[in-house]
Amino acid sequence: MFPLAYPLLFVLLGALSWWILPIISPLKRHHKLPPGPRGLPIIGSLHTLGALPHRTLQTLAKKYGPIMSMRLGSVPTIVVSSPQAAELFLKTHDNIFASRPKLQAAEYMSYGTMGMSFTAYGPHWRNIRKFVVLELLTPAKINSFVGMRREELGTVVKSIKEASAANEVVDLSAKVANIIENMTYRLLLGRTKDDRYDLKGIMNEALTLAGRFNIADFVPFLGPLDIQGLTRQFKDTGKRLDKILEFIIDEHEQNSSNGNASGDFIDDMLSLKNKPSNTHDELSKVIDRSVIKAIMIDIISAAIDTSDTSIEWILTELIKHPRAMKKCQEEIDAVVGVDRMVEETDLPNLEYVYMVVKEGLRLHPVAPLLGPHESMEDITINGYFIPKQSRVIVNSWALGRDPNVWSENAEEFLPERFEGSNVDVRGRDFQLLPFGSGRRGCPGMQLGLITVQLVVARLVHCFDWNLPNGTTPDNLDMTEKFGLTTPRVKHLLAVPKYRL
């Protein structure tokens, strides 16, 4: 999304700037914008963001304030860094900031404005979100896949148990990613893999591409030049992905006509698409093949890179803090016992486990800058003018580490801070926004929470975990990398010991 280092590119842009600057219209200078860094012509403050933009923006906010104005390329950008400011943008004035900017990756690899995640606010987006919430992600639908989640998790626990017997080192990051991938594909497709195509491979390629910094998203006049070669890659990957999705939809339609529908999400979407137009009238009008494919991509991209990154960081913190790990195990042993494994029905009774999950999401929100919002009209907030089509970035990472909210130990992993607290992760408490809030809050939040809690509880209950190769909790590498999500740079490796 943002550059790691593009010094030559920025030098060239800086040289161009003195020629192009006179023809660029300034922002409405007679209005009072929020304070912020001045930036350079053309590139604005892009060159300052570094490898971890959420950390850079937090540092800048300490200087300029919780509502900060800057230019990223030619895009006027507002950075929100306090719970009070986040509430203004995501609740009080949510109707103004509910849109999304147009991004090249979405245009070429996610059917433009046909899906939900990247679509501008309007009737089409409202209908698609309504369909996803009321048809695909209902509590009943989520509960109907309890057996699938149990089966997939059981398979991975079995493989880790075998590694435990052999005293082998386990790549926990890879194991968790495999669990989430398999659960997601079974939810969507009714199966985890098919030798006739490599959906996992092409989706991983698409997600990697989408997470790369694309100068054309910030300096649009450079788009046609494709100086990074990304446009060509977006188009090529999008075409190959479309071919696979078309094959999958054709197969589901054939199975449905033969009475062999499996009841997965694609079957649900095709069922609505094929209903008479007087049934679910507004929804049936907008659900076509392109929309179905866009929703498929939305669900895969929203599930795979988010839940596994959350679980990876929560397990990392527990291994780094053995006292918290032991406390989790003691609670689960008391509630569940040691004669069976944790089930979803146990989760409401595992209060400390949920505190651990909340603390992990506070310190390591998977999308530290959430999804970018875009203002749909001019507005004044706290005396500051926010121009129409400004890009709004909510620094969820900074919200979760604000010492004014979380006290001076905000950087510490301390699940007990949630003891007796009503602060939750569902978007009502603006100091903790791992899933966003308002109209653009994550519609799959409940499914994501269930999945994260279940996987963490099962792996903690079934195994003791020790660090390999002389690594200790004190020197465990906690370095993160920035993209669509913010996973660990190095995979989490540990030696399991089965305890049930």
Swiss-Prot record:
Organism: Panax ginseng (Korean ginseng)
A GO CC term attached to the entry: membrane
Keyword rRNA processing: no
Protein's name in the database: Cytochrome P450 CYP736A12
Keywords attached to this entry: Heme, Iron, Membrane, Metal-binding, Monooxygenase, Oxidoreductase, Transmembrane, Transmembrane helix
Sites where the protein binds heme: C442
Transmembrane feature ranges: 4-24
Its biological purpose: Probable heme-thiolate monooxygenase.
UniProt cofactor(s): heme
